[in-house]
């Protein structure tokens, strides 16, 4: 064993001699020396847009949510704090447009649902004040259009509809709405509403079995007509048929360290972007084909700095850019798609 370490030390000294000799004496020895290194390629799918936004000084609170109006090139951001505007509006290029604070208590989730005829944004409000425990629709300039739930009063009722800490929603182009209600509140449920706000189906029981939830935190749809729910407390993603509400399966194997806090598909439907709050991590997961959802397979990850805490994210349907609301860093960052490969050490 002693002879082994002597050999290792000797090799190290010899290599150091070659480096110094080449550096100070211009020796060609090192230039002709071949290193045998094992390489693998790691797929890099996104890069940080360091220039977004142009005016980060408008982030004056804790940023909890972000939405993208791809049709009109707008980015909405919900932030919390005292005596600050709760909703900020930027362009996709990062220029600040306006802010508003009307009838918003404590924003948690936000979704832009604009059409050719209407610019609108939906907000889930988890505040305990007069405007809390509601899901609300606004115009782009902050005019209140619709209120779902009983403002200022939490509850479990379906008629009239009541919420307790509604986490997020997703609005289809048809106008149908999917709401995950229960960010640590009385409810743990997924509700589908029609465009005239009638309940079409729901799953609403706390637990660990199929179609049961423990903090349903985010919801999205894919092009195959499936509803994907980040079941954060159970450390899994559950999947349902959007028309019938039938449970189609769950992904349990990818999130054993930390449950998913946010889910969104890329515009081409190839990937599901998943945020994990306390790990400060974004995972790019291969989307399954039509049929069985199979097993979760992580293609790539974006590891953020400690305590950045990505809460909710959104994907631009046109450009594929990913916007991440970070409650630890108190900012929103933008990641741009990039199809490239870089070498990294590995076996």
Swiss-Prot record:
<feature type="glycosylation site" description="N-linked (GlcNAc...) asparagine">
    <location>
        <position position="278"/>
    </location>
</feature>
<keyword id="KW-0325">Glycoprotein</keyword>
<dbReference type="Pfam" id="PF01436">
    <property type="entry name" value="NHL"/>
</dbReference>
<protein>
    <recommendedName>
        <fullName>NHL repeat-containing protein 3</fullName>
    </recommendedName>
</protein>
<dbReference type="GO" id="GO:0043161">
    <property type="term" value="P:proteasome-mediated ubiquitin-dependent protein catabolic process"/>
</dbReference>
<feature type="repeat" description="NHL 2">
    <location>
        <begin position="150"/>
        <end position="196"/>
    </location>
</feature>
<dbReference type="GO" id="GO:0005576">
    <property type="term" value="C:extracellular region"/>
</dbReference>
<keyword id="KW-0964">Secreted</keyword>
<feature type="repeat" description="NHL 1">
    <location>
        <begin position="47"/>
        <end position="93"/>
    </location>
</feature>
<dbReference type="GO" id="GO:0061630">
    <property type="term" value="F:ubiquitin protein ligase activity"/>
</dbReference>
<dbReference type="InterPro" id="IPR011042">
    <property type="entry name" value="6-blade_b-propeller_TolB-like"/>
</dbReference>
<feature type="glycosylation site" description="N-linked (GlcNAc...) asparagine">
    <location>
        <position position="101"/>
    </location>
</feature>
<keyword id="KW-0677">Repeat</keyword>
<feature type="glycosylation site" description="N-linked (GlcNAc...) asparagine">
    <location>
        <position position="206"/>
    </location>
</feature>
<keyword id="KW-0732">Signal</keyword>
<feature type="repeat" description="NHL 3">
    <location>
        <begin position="200"/>
        <end position="243"/>
    </location>
</feature>
<dbReference type="GO" id="GO:0035578">
    <property type="term" value="C:azurophil granule lumen"/>
</dbReference>
<dbReference type="GO" id="GO:0000209">
    <property type="term" value="P:protein polyubiquitination"/>
</dbReference>
<feature type="repeat" description="NHL 4">
    <location>
        <begin position="294"/>
        <end position="338"/>
    </location>
</feature>
<feature type="signal peptide">
    <location>
        <begin position="1"/>
        <end position="25"/>
    </location>
</feature>
<dbReference type="InterPro" id="IPR001258">
    <property type="entry name" value="NHL_repeat"/>
</dbReference>
<feature type="glycosylation site" description="N-linked (GlcNAc...) asparagine">
    <location>
        <position position="32"/>
    </location>
</feature>
């Amino acid at each position: 064993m002693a002879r082994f370490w002597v050999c290792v030390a000797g090799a190290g000294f010899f290599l150091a001699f070659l480096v110094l000799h080449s550096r100070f004496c211009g020796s060609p020895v090192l230039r002709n020396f071949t290193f045998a290194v094992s390489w693998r390629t790691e797929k890099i799918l996104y890069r940080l847009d360091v220039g977004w936004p142009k005016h980060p000084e408008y982030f004056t609170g804790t940023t909890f949510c972000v939405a993208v109006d791809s049709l009109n090139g707008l980015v909405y951001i919900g932030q919390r704090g005292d005596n600050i505007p709760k909703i900020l509006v930027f362009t996709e290029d990062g220029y600040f447009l306006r802010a508003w604070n009307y009838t918003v208590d404590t924003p948690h989730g936000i979704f832009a649902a604009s059409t050719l005829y209407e610019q609108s944004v939906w907000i889930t409000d988890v505040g305990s004040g007069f405007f809390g425990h509601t899901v609300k629709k606004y115009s782009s300039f902050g005019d209140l259009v619709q209120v779902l739930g009983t403002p200022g009063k939490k509850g479990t009722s379906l008629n009239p509809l009541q919420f307790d800490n509604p986490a997020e929603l997703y609005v289809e182009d048809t106008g149908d709405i999917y709401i995950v209600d229960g960010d640590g509140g009385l409810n743990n449920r997924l509700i589908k509403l029609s465009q005239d706000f009638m309940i079409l189906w729901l799953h609403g029981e706390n637990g660990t079995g199929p179609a049961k939830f423990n903090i349903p935190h985010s919801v999205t749809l894919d092009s195959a007509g499936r509803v994907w729910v980040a079941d954060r407390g159970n450390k899994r993603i559950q999947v349902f048929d959007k028309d019938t509400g039938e449970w189609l399966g769950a992904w349990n194997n990818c999130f054993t360290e930390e449950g998913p806090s946010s889910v969104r598909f890329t515009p081409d439907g190839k990937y599901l972007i998943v945020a994990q709050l306390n790990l400060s991590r974004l995972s790019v997961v291969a989307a399954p084909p039509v049929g069985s959802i199979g097993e979760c397979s992580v293609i790539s990850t974006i590891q953020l700095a400690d305590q950045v805490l990505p809460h909710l994210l959104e994907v631009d349907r046109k450009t594929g850019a990913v916007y991440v609301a970070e409650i630890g860093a108190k900012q929103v960052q933008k990641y741009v798609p990039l199809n490239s490969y870089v070498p990294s050490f590995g076996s």
